[in-house]
């Protein structure tokens, strides 16, 4: 039996972070965590691109274009959608996730979902460097591992 598992040091890989500008205080912290994690794991600064989009709704179309171009081994999607008084939150969060899944299934380029879907801004703060860690950093770790794993699979 052969066991496959990714590690955190894919050689020569380029990464792109696609991040929404909405809730910038939160998303800036997520981007910082992701960048720090990539660099801490041997990815050079010049092998990381950051693309800012208006909101989470726009992440899938940009991820799709980037995946088709093929310059990046993985796409790290970051954003923050906060529940409001209407169902808009559900549509944005759900369809953003579906769009990202569609991109990775159609292109074979991993699209890691670090888009927070939270009840309130306090929940987001806890996940952007607070008591629940930094989900941007965690998403970057998953990207590193997936790139390595996909390189190893037959």
From Swiss-Prot:
Name of the top EC class for this enzyme: transferase
Function: Catalyzes the formation of 6,7-dimethyl-8-ribityllumazine by condensation of 5-amino-6-(D-ribitylamino)uracil with 3,4-dihydroxy-2-butanone 4-phosphate. This is the penultimate step in the biosynthesis of riboflavin.
Active-site annotation: 88 (proton donor)
GO annotations of cellular component type: cytosol; riboflavin synthase complex
Name of this protein: 6,7-dimethyl-8-ribityllumazine synthase
Entry annotated with the keyword Transferase: yes
Subunit structure comment from the entry: Forms an icosahedral capsid composed of 60 subunits, arranged as a dodecamer of pentamers.
HAMAP family, A to Z: Lumazine_synth
Highest taxon in the source lineage: Bacteria
Gene Ontology annotations of biological process type: riboflavin biosynthetic process
Keywords of this entry: Riboflavin biosynthesis, Transferase
One GO MF term attached to the UniProt entry: 6,7-dimethyl-8-ribityllumazine synthase activity
InterPro entries per the UniProt record, alphabetical: LS, LS/RS, LS/RS_sf
Catalysis: reaction(s): (2S)-2-hydroxy-3-oxobutyl phosphate + 5-amino-6-(D-ribitylamino)uracil = 6,7-dimethyl-8-(1-D-ribityl)lumazine + phosphate + 2 H2O + H(+)
Gene3D superfamilies: Lumazine/riboflavin synthase
Pfam families membership: DMRL_synthase (PF00885)
UniProt-annotated binding residues for 5-amino-6-(D-ribitylamino)uracil: 22, 56-58, 80-82, 113
Metabolic or biological pathway, per its Swiss-Prot or TrEMBL entry: Cofactor biosynthesis; riboflavin biosynthesis; riboflavin from 2-hydroxy-3-oxobutyl phosphate and 5-amino-6-(D-ribitylamino)uracil: step 1/2
Enzyme Commission code(s) on record: 2.5.1.78
Binding sites annotated in the UniProt record for (2S)-2-hydroxy-3-oxobutyl phosphate: 85-86, 127
Similarity-based family: Belongs to the DMRL synthase family.
